[in-house]
Amino acid sequence: MGYLAAYGVVILLIIGIYSFGYAAKQTSLLTVVILETFFGLLLILPLLLFVNKIGFAQIFTLPTQQNWLWLGAAALMGFVLGNYFSLMHIRESGEKLNSLLSPAITALTIVLSYFLLNDKLAAYQWAGILLALITIVFFLLKQSNIHLQNQNFKGIYSGVATIICISFTIICTIKGVGDLPFLLAIWLRLFVAFILLLPPFIFSYKNKNLLPKNYLFYTIVFIGVLAQTIGAAYLWLYSSFHISVSVFQIILATLPLFMYAIDVYIFKKSKPSLYFLICAFVAAAGITLAML
């Protein structure tokens, strides 16, 4: 089941990337992020109350101070900053290129785990990490030449910011989950993120035109929340406890290849790119080496 969960994460991430990519092009990024957290809170709460049998008061008293601290940090780095920059990168560079950040996130997370979680790394694992990071950075630099010609820097710094924020989020989540039920850990991250996002959203809300009025937008956001915010997050935690972290990360490194096939041959949103495929394969090889 752990392997199925890992591939489920890949599938649900693809659905989430396209769903939130569509939403990010319809309204402000802040609106999409706060809707994601709001829908996530509403969807998970009944599951906590009626499936996990956790009382409403227990939702806030069951977590320890350490749970709140680390999951709160994960909320800030992930659901607030990470999601914001990821949506910006999707809007500026497209869904296919956004998926290529995944191996770099994995590589940086391994580096952070060495310093923050005291994980051991052999020389060949460091070589794999550097191979993955250098490949993605080189790809971003190549893309930067295109962006610089158009005086567009958002696609560059948003990609780098996404890698950094999501990597720290993973470390904070690992340290913050503890003995909490997976759904409760996800809900707490969403709750803290919603509290952090609400003041700037209210401040920026000048008129009702800020929120799209078509039902398709909200339906797609809802699908994205089910797929990525809840489904992928839950299966990620589940698979982390049922298969080795190395196997899971190797499976996750195939995300850009799946995205390439879907983006080019199914949705036909972008043209075939041998350079992208080479970068994706080399980055995946680097992650595989780092996880041996």
Residue ranges and their predicted role:
Residues M1-T31, L35-A73, N83-S93, L141-V160, ...:
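Membrane-interface interhelical linkers
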Residues G8, L35-E36, L101-A104, Y124-A127, ...:
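Hydrophobic core positions of alpha-helical segments in small-molecule transporters
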Residues I44, V111-Y114, Y124-Q143, L274-L292:
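Hydrophobic transmembrane alpha-helices of multi-pass small-molecule transport proteins
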Residues I44-G55, L108-L121, I164-D179, A227-F241, ...:
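Hydrophobic alpha-helical transmembrane segments in multi-pass integral membrane proteins
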